[in-house]
Amino acid sequence: MDNGSNQLHVLFLPYFATGHIIPLVNAARLFVFHAGVKVTILTTHHNASLFRSTIDNDVEDGHSVISIHTLRFPSTEVGLPEGIENFSSASSPELAGKVFYAIYLLQKPMEDKIREIHPDCIFSDMYLPWTVNIALELKIPRLLFNQSSYMYNSILYNLRLYKPHKSKTITSTDSISVPGLPDKIEFKLSQLTDDLIKPEDEKNAFDELLDRTRESEDRSYGIVHDTFYELEPAYADYYQKVKKTKCWQIGPISHFSSKLFRRKELINAVDESNSCAIVEWLNEQEHKSVLYVSFGSVVRFPEAQLTEIAKALEASSIPFIWVVKKDQSAETTCLLEEEKLKNKGLIIRGWAPQLTILDHSAVGGFMTHCGWNSILEAIIAGVPLVTWPVFAEQFYNEKLVEVMGLGVKVGAEVHESNGGVEISSLVIESEKIKEAIEKLMDDSKESQKIREKVIGMSEMAKNAVEEGGSSWNNLTALIDDIKNFTSTTNV
């Protein structure tokens, strides 16, 4: 306990990607609010700037202080421009590789800082597997933060266990069934992540990181998931049974934190005046008529694919908000399409206030890359999905949407190997995109059924984080468990 007091001190360590920082920092805020835990966040200067003012606002509102310790990001050592300190800022595979190496170089200074802080518990992103070793050295628990669904983890566990994808007769276009799961789950070989299908001698540094991440799970005190029991009860039960590691689900963390704190958007990059203009435009649209199109902070489609998306939006009768990268190239064709589209919708370059947009009553659909944060935020808002997975666990996340009946698919079939920074798969044509949009946004019995399911799941998500709800109780149980462990070891 901290300085001889009875206050539990938990150190939070985010991975350096915006989609990882947001839920972990929100989890840190929950610990402060929910149980009066002393919280410290360890990161770098630029990454801290993404959320520092939100933490300051929490303090102004009377909440406990969260200490933020920052280290210098080794930009010079790896040849990165100043200010690029996470993967969301990397506009090419080359820059992303340098960010990855810089994170590796930060391990020793972070270890030294952890020894200096000497917390009672480490709450670490899954992609910092070395934190389990420093936790064991300090004789404190390490909680691994796995910001993904139980279904995804169950799929991955069974693929590694049964290896149906290793059959020599399977081609990249064949479908494989994942054995042993509560539902029939099938994938094409081309949709599986590289760590499953690459030969050992072809694995890269990130594949090796995934191996270390899995190994660190079994040596951690427990795993914290950003999901809620009611979303996937069969998979929560299944995974906890086969994994035999303590697991707690405390999500949807974004809604949990926004319910307890006045600021909805965590990231400080959101321009308040731009947010107001977006809301004003949405106020003029009909109920559930707008399609929100966003592919997260990392995915960068080539010009040819952007043009096909623009054609699909132009050809449909659906008003839209489309988010594209601020530094994305805007060649003549895309500018032409943007000029045609501007009377039908909004094109936002840069970061968008996603929670604000999804919560608006005019938004009736969300075309997404199937990042887990985005799926949860859509479920909370009761907004059905058009799914377009690209990389990482996104094809597995799409299966949850499919099985739960929460959306429709564009029909992506190829998992990207380079983290979505540079798309190399075939362009999906506008007609196929338009078909998926209209299938979700029309007034057919199928789309109505999808909407009913999403709205029902939204209510369950909101109830989960109310006092006495499943995630509320899980968070309480988690903190009590760590307190009991700490008090026992300090006797």
From Swiss-Prot:
GO biological process, any: saponin biosynthetic process
Q: Name one GO molecular function term.
A: nuatigenin 3-beta-glucosyltransferase activity
The UniProt entry, under CDD domains, shows: GT1_Gtf-like (cd03784)
Active site residues of this protein: H20 (proton acceptor), D125 (charge relay)
* Highest taxon in the source lineage: Eukaryota
Q: What is its EC number?
A: 2.4.1.192
Segments forming a coiled coil: none
Q: Pfam families given for it?
A: UDPGT
Transmembrane feature ranges: none
Tissues in which the protein is found = Expressed in roots, stems and leaves.
Say yes or no: keyword ATP-binding present: no
Q: Which UniProt keyword terms apply here? A: Glycosyltransferase, Transferase
* Upregulation: Down-regulated after wounding.
Q: Which reaction does it catalyse?
A: nuatigenin + UDP-alpha-D-glucose = nuatigenin 3-beta-D-glucopyranoside + UDP + H(+); diosgenin + UDP-alpha-D-glucose = diosgenin 3-O-beta-D-glucoside + UDP + H(+); tigogenin + UDP-alpha-D-glucose = tigogenin 3-O-beta-D-glucopyranoside + UDP + H(+); solasodine + UDP-alpha-D-glucose = solasodine 3-beta-D-glucoside + UDP + H(+)
- Where UDP-alpha-D-glucose binds, per the record, is at A352, Q354, H369, W372, N373, S374, E377, E393, Q394
List residues binding an anthocyanidin. Answer: H20, A392
The record's comment on protein family reads: Belongs to the UDP-glycosyltransferase family.
Protein task:
Glucosyltransferase involved in steroid saponin biosynthesis. Catalyzes the 3-O-glucosylation of steroidal sapogenins, such as diosgenin, nuatigenin and tigogenin. Can glucosylate steroidal alkaloids, such as solanidine, solasodine and tomatidine.
This protein's name:
Nuatigenin 3-beta-glucosyltransferase
The species this protein was found in: Solanum aculeatissimum (Dutch eggplant)
Q: Which gene encodes it?
A: GT4A
